[in-house]
Amino acid sequence: VGFKAGVKEYKLTYYTPEYETKDTDILAAFRVTPQPGVPPEEAGAAVAAESSTGTWTTVWTDGLTSLDRYKGRCYNIEPVLGETDQYICYVAYPLDLFEEGSVTNMFTSIVGNVFGFKALRALRLEDLRIPPAYIKTFQGPPHGIQVERDELNKYGRPLLGCTIKPKLGLSAKNYGRACYECLRGGLDFTKDDENVNSQPFMRWRDRFLFCAEAIYKAQAETGEIKGHYLNATAGTCEEMIKRAVFARELGVPIVMHDYLTGGFTANTSLAHYCRDNGLLLHIHRAMHAVIDRQKNHGMHFRVLAKALRLSGGDHIHSGTVVGKLEGERDITLGFVDLLRDDFIEKDRSRGIYFTQDWVSLPGVIPVASGGIHVWHMPALTEIFGDDSVLQFGGGTLGHPWGNAPGAVANRVALEACVQARNEGRDLAAEGNEIIREPSKWSPELAAACEVWKEIKFEFKAVDTLD
């Protein structure tokens, strides 16, 4: 066969509306905004080509392989309601394009160079369908929801956490003291802020030692298992693992990683270490809004959440719906289910473009954190249910009487909400009353209620459903 050089329209090769997707294909839903004058078929085909086998011109070496076997295919295009010149393009990728067990490689292909492509004004990856054949090449979360509950011996309620503030500037001893007071007051976990690594004012080893002391002291006094998310994130993978090893030697239950700034390769390495050594892994999503906040460009957080479940983590921050950070209720609950459940049906009203079967990969506990306080407790209990961690940083440490009373207030409020729910009361309608009742006999809760009675963060979410 003679080789025909030259530039060929992508849609002639990569737009295949008749294609029947296979169970082993990775499916992607892209929100595509083409440049003026570029037809949607060409734009969708360009995305499929540039994120799989294609390049800008035909090449002689195409003849040495089977494009039909390896190319990505744009198999469906839908206009976006209410937007002119914006489309959802569905692309199917053959499984052979991806290295097994590598989120890094999957993203390098699917969301690599194609996002800088000139023929597109903007491009956003809305959702991915990961086939069971690919999921089975990943370890996934180190332990998962059930194992964590069994290790902590805590059932039937959300877990409570608190990020230690001020996030930067405390000495290790004062930091440990703040942890102890929160845990002693009734929280299950305290947390390193995501920016706390190993700075001049507090080196990591000192922090780990004082936090471990706080955990053991609080456990002895309360009879409950406690934890502190020790942030193992570091400048190199080797240093990160070194910190995780030290945490294990101290006998603490959980470490933490910033998975986007640290990178998926580092995260997967740490997740493997955590499973092999019985450590839980808390994941913070610092940098996610750089990628996911704009509605027409980047990548939706539900994709980052799916990627994390593959890479490995037992907790991940997922927005609050009611606090200070971005997140619409239906969308947030959509990816919360994607994190926790084993099987999720396609549901466009919640932004879920594909049915996803996780084939028994362990679940991840969503963490609600950011601008929440005792008055939010009924809403949080209703929205997130039992398998969640509710984190009150300022909502604990900002208590007028100090950290321990702040922790007491949160624990009393949570227990009241769980009891009310179990009695069949309507948390949404009776929320304020449910919080007021226990504040009659809990002075700590009464003081917290007084401080935060008027605080609200009411702005419309930027990233909404169409």
Curated annotation (Swiss-Prot):
Positions of post-translational N6-carboxylysine modification: K191
Residues with the N6,N6,N6-trimethyllysine modification: K4
Designated gene of the protein: rbcL
Annotated localization: Plastid, Chloroplast
UniProt record similarity statement: Belongs to the RuBisCO large chain family. Type I subfamily.
GO biological process per UniProt: photorespiration; reductive pentose-phosphate cycle
UniProt-recorded name of the protein: Ribulose bisphosphate carboxylase large chain
Note: The basic functional RuBisCO is composed of a large chain homodimer in a 'head-to-tail' conformation. In form I RuBisCO this homodimer is arranged in a barrel-like tetramer with the small subunits forming a tetrameric 'cap' on each end of the 'barrel'.
Annotated NCBIfam families: PRK04208.1
Keywords assigned: Calvin cycle, Carbon dioxide fixation, Chloroplast, Disulfide bond, Lyase, Magnesium, Metal-binding, Methylation, Monooxygenase, Oxidoreductase, Photorespiration, Photosynthesis, Plastid
Site (Transition state stabilizer) location in chain: K324
The keyword Glycosyltransferase belongs to this UniProt entry's keyword annotation: no
Binding-site positions, substrate: N113, T163, K167, R285, H317, S369
Catalytic residue list: K165 (proton acceptor), H284 (proton acceptor)
Single GO MF descriptor: ribulose-bisphosphate carboxylase activity
Cofactor descriptive note: Binds 1 Mg(2+) ion per subunit.
Reaction catalysed by this enzyme: 2 (2R)-3-phosphoglycerate + 2 H(+) = D-ribulose 1,5-bisphosphate + CO2 + H2O; D-ribulose 1,5-bisphosphate + O2 = 2-phosphoglycolate + (2R)-3-phosphoglycerate + 2 H(+)
Enzyme Commission number(s): 4.1.1.39
InterPro entries (alphabetical): RuBisCO, RuBisCo_large_chain_AS, RuBisCO_lsu_C, RuBisCO_lsu_C_sf, RuBisCO_lsu_fd_N, RuBisCO_lsu_N_sf, RuBisCO_lsuI
Transmembrane segments: none
Keyword Metal-binding in annotation: yes
